[in-house]
Amino acid sequence: MKKLTALFNLPELKNDIELHNMVLDSRKVKAGDLFVAIKGHQVDGNQFIDSALHSGASAVVSETELSSEHLTVEFIGNVPVVKYHQLARHLSSLADVFYDSPSKNLTLVGVTGTNGKTTISQLLAQWAELLGHRAAVMGTIGNGLFRQIVEAKNTTGSAVEIQSSLSTFKHAGADFTSIEVSSHGLAQHRVEALHFKAAIFTNLTRDHLDYHQSMENYAAAKKRLFTELDTQIKVINADDEIGYQWLTELPDAIAVSMNADFKVGSHQWMKAINIHYHFKGADITFESSWGNGVLHSPLIGAFNVSNLLLVMTTLLSFGYPLENLLATAKSLKGVCGRMEMIQYPNKPTVIVDYAHTPDALEKALIAAREHCQGELWCIFGCGGDRDRGKRPLMAQIAEQFAEKIIVTKDNPRTEPQSQIEADIVAGFKNMEKVGIIPDRAQAIQFAIESAVENDVILIAGKGHEHYQIIGSEVVHFSDQEIALDFLK
């Protein structure tokens, strides 16, 4: 329970209005809640104030475009409506007060970058548990205490959802939380009032340009986590061009590299000296500001070496002994839908991965190649109603790194599948090794029945998702389930 006057110390407000929850969706309002009416990109919450009042809201905070109306109060019946200028920008701070600053009582790590956020946030929570913590995670796969994750709608939830979830985690006994921080979440100030013990930057490649319009805007949104928010420790991938540039501007940041020739400067640092890849993962010989050693990784692919080094560096910066981390690393498990290997005797190996950008697809194919003795197959599509510019680029990547390619459905949404396919096909130089099978299950079936034992089939784009969005309908679909059916 929180008194309304704890949020707004205004003379018009009585001291006896107690609130249960902050709620953005009028359909979820219950008696005693504070309804937050924000002007969103598609819907204006002010249109639903009457609905919220009908459901029993005890108070409303309403976004106004007029600065002169800021913190003025009007009443609808006995219910106060507090006008708030630039409410969306300040909502994280209001929710922080409402939920008693939960991030101050947690070790909170934010992870941002185009690729690797999910793997890193899941590994952080998993490793924290191995070190004796009660960990929680928020991101693409879902939110919740580790191993009790509930599916999420967005990578980074609303400002209210984030603070509310962190409060729930804290009261459930969590003392460590990792959170994926998307560029949308940063640009829209959804994580503004969080207190980060550390933030990790993975990489920056083309994605979300339908929203950000330019790579410069996209990079600027990501950078806010390291320059404008309350972030104590900054861990940055020095092998990324943008990351390397940021390191020159952030003298207190920690540099992480897979390059043995990386020149160590004034930063704290971690670098791989030698990497031996094998079918069960990789053995990483490293040097660092905290000592040297060999890290045995259970994850496949070069990019997962980078992911794991970023995670270990973060934990070292918190003061965990190197020997404890090396001992517990052997117990780490892979992440659902992230280079997830499915194998049956005498059948081709199937790898399911979430790769849905040109850079992620390239990294996934290179990683799959390391485990392929025969031909490498690539099954992929592109989401509808999203950045069309990346479609031919993904075709070029597939053609460069795979012997056999099948173009299929991803989540076409409301865009004609034929248009998506045409955009992809425009990127191929030669169609000889390309097949188009729109039905995704049939595409997977064809590849598994056509490939031989030493071949590897990468099914890219959906990863952990167990649905397809076709038109406005969401239908059940799992790459893993389909692959298992045809491998048996």
Swiss-Prot record:
Which positions does UniProt annotate for ATP binding? G113, T114, N115, G116, K117, T118, T119
Q: What does this protein do?
A: Catalyzes the addition of meso-diaminopimelic acid to the nucleotide precursor UDP-N-acetylmuramoyl-L-alanyl-D-glutamate (UMAG) in the biosynthesis of bacterial cell-wall peptidoglycan.
Residue numbers binding meso-2,6-diaminopimelate: R386, D410, N411, P412, R413, G461, E465
Q: Which cofactor does it need?
A: Mg(2+)
SUPFAM superfamilies per UniProt: MurD-like peptide ligases, catalytic domain (SSF53623), MurD-like peptide ligases, peptide-binding domain (SSF53244), MurE/MurF N-terminal domain (SSF63418)
Processing after translation: Carboxylation is probably crucial for Mg(2+) binding and, consequently, for the gamma-phosphate positioning of ATP.
Annotated Gene Ontology MF terms?
ATP binding; magnesium ion binding; UDP-N-acetylmuramoylalanyl-D-glutamate-2,6-diaminopimelate ligase activity
List the subcellular locations: Cytoplasm
Q: Which family does it belong to?
A: Belongs to the MurCDEF family. MurE subfamily.
From the record, which residues define motif Meso-diaminopimelate recognition motif?
410-413
Give the E.C. number(s).
6.3.2.13
Query: Which top EC class applies here?
Result: ligase
Q: In which pathway does it act?
A: Cell wall biogenesis; peptidoglycan biosynthesis
Q: Which residues get modified to N6-carboxylysine? A: K222
* Database matches in PANTHER family: MUR LIGASE FAMILY MEMBER (PTHR23135), UDP-N-ACETYLMURAMOYL-L-ALANYL-D-GLUTAMATE--2,6-DIAMINOPIMELATE LIGASE MURE HOMOLOG, CHLOROPLASTIC (PTHR23135:SF4)
The protein's name is: UDP-N-acetylmuramoyl-L-alanyl-D-glutamate--2,6-diaminopimelate ligase
What the entry lists under Gene3D superfamilies is as follows: Mur ligase, C-terminal domain (3.90.190.20), Mur-like, catalytic domain (3.40.1190.10), MurE/MurF, N-terminal domain (3.40.1390.10)
**Disulfide pairings:** none
Q: Which residues form a coiled coil?
A: none
Organism of derivation:
Haemophilus influenzae (strain PittGG)
NCBIfam families hit by this protein: murE, PRK00139.1-1, PRK00139.1-2, PRK00139.1-4
Task: Report if keyword Cell membrane is assigned.
Answer: no
Q: Where do the annotations place UDP-N-acetyl-alpha-D-muramoyl-L-alanyl-D-glutamate binding?
A: L24, S26, H41, Q42, V43, N154, T155, T156, S182, Q188, R190
Q: Which GO terms describe its cellular component?
A: cytoplasm
Which keywords does this chain's UniProt record carry? ATP-binding, Cell cycle, Cell division, Cell shape, Cell wall biogenesis/degradation, Cytoplasm, Ligase, Magnesium, Nucleotide-binding, Peptidoglycan synthesis
Biological process according to GO: cell division; cell wall organization; peptidoglycan biosynthetic process; regulation of cell shape
Reactions the enzyme catalyzes:
UDP-N-acetyl-alpha-D-muramoyl-L-alanyl-D-glutamate + meso-2,6-diaminopimelate + ATP = UDP-N-acetyl-alpha-D-muramoyl-L-alanyl-gamma-D-glutamyl-meso-2,6-diaminopimelate + ADP + phosphate + H(+)
